[in-house]
Design a protein with these regions (language model features):
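Active-site-adjacent structural elements in enzyme catalytic cores
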Residues: 1-170
Length: 170
């Protein structure tokens, strides 16, 4: 059974447990609500695609608390994107990072040229940044079934996913 919780220390600990167990959590962002999981857990990523009925060719982004987390994920932000990121992040800007050989993310996509890439975002929301600082980077997509309107409220996210998502943070 799913639960809807206000963001606090207890609900963040619960979310960390859900994420560590390969589950899905809905979180608020600076734009819409998102469904999120561990970006290193292939089964959890598959679950996002399944509950959204999302085509696999549509990549997931990775939400970060700061661009300082890129190096630890095995990602590089090439020039001039690194300068643009410094100017526009946090915010609704999603640059494409290049994955190094040491990248462990299961969300990385290959370009037709064979380059491995990952869209990243640092949300401009104190609440979302608090969540990301507690849980770490998250693979995410908008909280809606593919083709439907994105959830603007936690109630809309619950309506979209019901018990397919273990925890809803608001």
């Amino acid at each position: 059974m799913s639960a809807v919780r206000k963001v606090n220390e207890e609900s963040l600990a619960e979310a960390a447990s859900v994420i560590a167990g390969g589950g899905l959590v809905v979180i608020p962002t600076d734009t819409v609500y998102g469904v999120a999981c561990d970006p290193r857990n292939e089964a959890a990523i598959d679950r996002i695609y399944q509950v959204k009925s999302r085509p696999r060719f549509k990549a997931l982004q990775v939400l970060l608390a700061s661009v300082d987390q890129l190096d630890g994920l095995g990602l590089d932000l090439p020039s001039p994107l690194n300068r643009l990121a410094a100017q526009f992040l946090p915010g609704a800007f999603s640059p494409i990072a290049v994955a190094r050989e040491d990248c462990t993310l299961a969300t990385v996509s290959a370009t037709p040229q064979g380059r491995r890439t990952q869209g990243i975002r640092v949300p401009n929301s104190a609440l979302t940044l608090r969540i990301l600082n507690e849980l770490g980077p998250l693979a995410a997509s908008s909280a809606n079934r593919s083709g439907d309107e994105s959830a603007q409220t936690v109630e809309e996210a619950v309506q979209a996913f019901g018990d397919d998502v273990q925890l809803y943070l608001d």
